[in-house]
Amino acid sequence: MELSQSRYLSALPELTWGIQRFCLVKQSKQEKYDKAYLRMAHEWGKLSYCKRKQVGAIVVKKRMIISDGYNGTPTGFENFCEDDEGYTKWYVLHAEANALSKVAASTQSCEGATLYITLSPCRECSKLIHQSGIKRVVYQIEYKDNSGLEFLKRAGVELQHLPTIESAV
């Protein structure tokens, strides 16, 4: 009995090292996916007609993109996001709201999905994100008012801030 315990204890450091290495490889692979999806969200944001901010969002579930969105005016409205004074019109939809609306109109569900977004969500969008069942939000730039992030954290949504998204070639 004592011999097998001794063998077990001597193998423990090697086992621990193996588990740590596995976790690092898995984390590294996940970070590559996160950065790739965030780059896609960045490209999607370029489709926005808004002059002040161009924000893109991608919803991913089981490594499949199930929705996308960018900030802009609702369907049927002229594509001018700012008024004559340069302020954003009140009815402009945020990127994440557009992406979540598309999912709601489809056969898909956001339950357990990840939202990739170029600008962290505002308070209103954070409520939609939580209610939609999204479990993880990866964002590039932090919005000046971080109460949306605080709400999501309190709701148990995992948050990942990736300020640098260029690929390591």
Kindly label every feature range from the protein language model.
Residues 4-169:
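Zinc-dependent deaminase catalytic domain
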